[in-house]
Amino acid sequence: MYLRRVLLPTIVLSLSCPFSGAAAEFYVSTGGDDSQVGTAAEPFVTISRAQRAVRELKARGTLTVPVTVNIMPGTYPMASPLVFTPADSGTEACPVTYRRRGDGPVVLSGGRRLTGFARTDALWTLSIDAVKAGDWTFNQLYVNGRRRPRARTPNEGSYFRVNSALPEGKGGRRGFRYGKGHVREWENLEEVVFVVLASWYNTVHHVKELDAANRTVRFTNRAGRPFSWYEGHLRYYVENVAEGLDQPGEWFLDRASGVLSYFPLPGETLEDVEIVAPVVSQTLVRLQGEPGEGRYVEHVRFEGLQMRHTDAHLPKDLYDARQAATVQDAGLLADGARHCVFTDCEVANMGEHGIWFRDDCHHNLVERCHVHDLGGGGIYVGEKWRWGNNCPGWPGYKDLESIPHVTEHNTVDNCFVHNGCHLFTGSIGIWVGQAAHTTVSHNEICDMSYSGVSVGWDWSGNSSTSHHNTIERNHIHHIGHRKMNDMAGIYTLGVSPGTVLRNNHIHDVQAYQSPKGYCLGAGIYLDQSSAEITIQDNVCHDVSNAGFFIHHGANNRVLNNVFAEIEANGRIGWGMYFTSRLGKADRGNVAVGNIVHVPSGKAAKATQEKGKHGDGEAYDFVTIDRNVYWSSEKAMLTFSQSHGDEPEHMHGLNGWQRSGHDGESVTADPLFADPAKRDFSLGPGSPARKLGIRSIDTSAAGLYGDSAWVDLPKSTRYRAHDQV
């Protein structure tokens, strides 16, 4: 014991000497003990104890050497979040690093492994005393490293339909009438969860009152919009229902009895299964600076770690109708973080989002991280809504440059984000909101139910703190699953000067195709007031509705892109579609040097909408020229134009040119290198070259590095489309 008392001071004294090449090291091992001194021979057993040792080291004086906490392979259970404050900071010269040391994974787990299951017919069952006593519950379950769905009706991919909203009329947000046989007076009615899908978001509800005779259900929380909105009869399913436990992979927790029931998948055995239930809700690792006090978590690095097993927060008053699910939190959540790094980490089995650098975060880096199996989205950068006049959310400030605490100069590079949106279906692969100078590059994003990348985040049309963001060389594909609508491979919102979307490869975007409401799945989508954005050298193909769509906006430049094999379904289904508002100055848009390759022949549309912004006179809001149009099915190419209440005018190219568009454009086979194999580079003799259109090489989009990392997406199993 005497040796243990003196070793740490000896280490610390040596660290106070500024000799060159020195480093402070602590060790953590599952076989360690927190009463030990944290050396390789006598490691700690918890990361929090090592964190305290770093603080003790700092308390003796300014760091003069880098500090490394070496974490040996194994699983480290956590009953509460690991919180880093300004007291845990390093410096530029002496960062503090928490890293994996040795072969094998290091897992920071917010869950508890469950053992002792018994076979009961086709199910495995386990009685959990803490659940029966009311001390623990969970709404997520992870088996052999993958999330399993809670028992639901109807089963995954299918839905019931709302009959009518309650209360009746436009304000029906508290409940609805349901169809015969869809809902029952289940024994655990207070624990049942209704999940309702609208266009771009979903809401989660607990039951307040059920009237089986009149087939009505009322909820403890209201929906963000009426249940009659969008398509009149929204889709929904009911989760955590014992009677819904009817197919392999599902599970049900009876809180009254404390019994967990699991329907195993074929091939799963009790002898080698790992079943983990989360103890920690929402956030596992927290970087908690104090921006208002000018104190930040700085120069802390995390290398080679896995963070797993959190729950979702589903209170009875949950309000979660925000676009992009920005009400939810993340497994790794940062406020007031600067110069922090997550590299070569895996973030998985999260109840909500994966990673979020939120308020006042500067110069942080997320690189080569594998973020997957998520209740929500992947990686979020920036802040929630900032409404206001000119300076959104910051009243009293006269110019954007003086607004405090803006998130800026952050980078998300070379990350693989996939298999998300399991609970909060309107979440994003990588989201950038009210942030500036963000770089999102070389990421692969797939198997998400909503948009791949979103950037901007203001509806007002005023200046915002979102500007100079770069979205480049990302590979975004197999998203939507025909589950969510009003989405895109890349989606923007609001005025974003200096923002560039370039050299991205986007394909297999499949939006929900409503039988009554509008349908929009786009390759690239500039929504509400998007302005001052450059869209250049992107390739978008195999998209359900529009290759490119702009919904009001000004001074956007769409240059040298390929929009190919666009299905062009529905009224918004066109190769390129431009809208503006009469009475609103949505001017200065340019679409030049693009190739539109549409099987249906629906090439381009420009419309000025009459609406709440006033009628006004028609005006030129977009310059469209020097483009190449072609139908791979040799269909007649059509172009459409409309102004306010005027009837839609359909043209061939000649009529379209007489209306003032595409004067130097052509209809011709662009002679792609191999469109059947989705190679849309330009082959020899392409007529596009005569118009100054350059061939686009998509090979650099997505991940880079060693073959094991670059090939990792090849093992991804994409979810099936919803059956609606």
What are these regions (language model features)?
Residues 365:
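Core nucleic-acid recognition elements
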Residues 27-348, 387-404, 645-668, 676-723:
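Extracellular polysaccharide-degrading/modifying enzymes targeting complex plant/algal/animal polysaccharides
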Residues 6-18:
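Bacterial N-terminal signal peptides
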Residues 81, 312-334, 348, 352-362, ...:
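Glycine- and acidic/polar-rich repeat regions and solenoidal domains
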Residues 21-24:
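Boundary at the C-terminal end of the N-terminal hydrophobic targeting segment
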Residues 1-3:
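N-terminal secretory signal peptides that target proteins for export/translocation
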